[in-house]
Amino acid sequence: MKMTKSALVTGASRGIGRSIALQLAEEGYNVAVNYAGSKEKAEAVVEEIKAKGVDSFAIQANVADADEVKAMIKEVVSQFGSLDVLVNNAGITRDNLLMRMKEQEWDDVIDTNLKGVFNCIQKATPQMLRQRSGAIINLSSVVGAVGNPGQANYVATKAGVIGLTKSAARELASRGITVNAVAPGFIVSDMTDALSDELKEQMLTQIPLARFGQDTDIANTVAFLASDKAKYITGQTIHVNGGMYM
């Protein structure tokens, strides 16, 4: 009988994280839904996951806090018996021009988006080493490859995630653990919905496929990297951006 595998998705109460959690559930994973703010939204995702016939629970943790992350990993293993897939999706923005950016704006984004990924990988690794298997998928961004004005802090973290992914992949490969990154381009969200038609048209001119991506495009890519079909892929960054960056 095939054993059910388990996954932890950080920042999974909404947006891309929610879509990833639901897709992994569709693939048969038990899924822990991490959140930082809204317990209500996280619990709603849990109910959607359970409706697919797998187990799920919501767990609050600030990924920038190593102790909270350690406790979260321990709880996931306690409830599910294993941790087979870690998806580092949690992230924030504090946009500002470089000359005007406050130190706190820089630190907040670095702590969540880069240190948070490090914390989760470091605390999840002992369990995966014991299992001699695991898949870690980190969310980067197209801007980590091309840069973006007004987002020096965010861009630095997303470029850093790519480097961290490569280093972790080299360290963990001998133990059967893969580490990859997914770098979304412009994805339909509340942010893109609020943009003017003129600005949307301007953004679309940068995308050869001439459309914005859907969060399911990202979720499907993550699910593939988490699967046995991707066992010979590690240290890679998969760009899902409609050709915006090649």
From Swiss-Prot:
Molecular-function GO terms, alphabetical: 3-oxoacyl-[acyl-carrier-protein] reductase (NADPH) activity; NAD binding
Catalytic activity entry: a (3R)-hydroxyacyl-[ACP] + NADP(+) = a 3-oxoacyl-[ACP] + NADPH + H(+)
Residues the entry annotates as binding substrate: 141
Domain of life: Bacteria
EC id: 1.1.1.100
CDD domains: BKR_SDR_c (cd05333)
Catalytic residues (positions): 154
InterPro entries: 3oxo_ACP_reduc, NAD(P)-bd_dom_sf, Sc_DH/Rdtase_CS, SDR, SDR_fam
GO biological process: fatty acid biosynthetic process
Residues binding NADP(+), per UniProt: 11-14, 62-63, 89, 154-158, 187
Keyword Disulfide bond: no
Key words of the record: Fatty acid biosynthesis, Fatty acid metabolism, Lipid biosynthesis, Lipid metabolism, NADP, Oxidoreductase
Pathway linked to the protein: Lipid metabolism; fatty acid biosynthesis
Task performed by this protein: Catalyzes the NADPH-dependent reduction of beta-ketoacyl-ACP substrates to beta-hydroxyacyl-ACP products, the first reductive step in the elongation cycle of fatty acid biosynthesis.
Assembly mode: Homotetramer.
Family membership: Belongs to the short-chain dehydrogenases/reductases (SDR) family.
NCBIfam families listed in its UniProt record: 3oxo_ACP_reduc (TIGR01830), PRK05653.1-1 (NF004197), PRK05653.1-3 (NF004198), PRK05653.1-4 (NF004199), PRK05653.1-5 (NF004200), PRK07231.1 (NF005559), PRK12826.1-2 (NF009466)
Protein name per Swiss-Prot or TrEMBL: 3-oxoacyl-[acyl-carrier-protein] reductase FabG
Gene it is expressed from: fabG
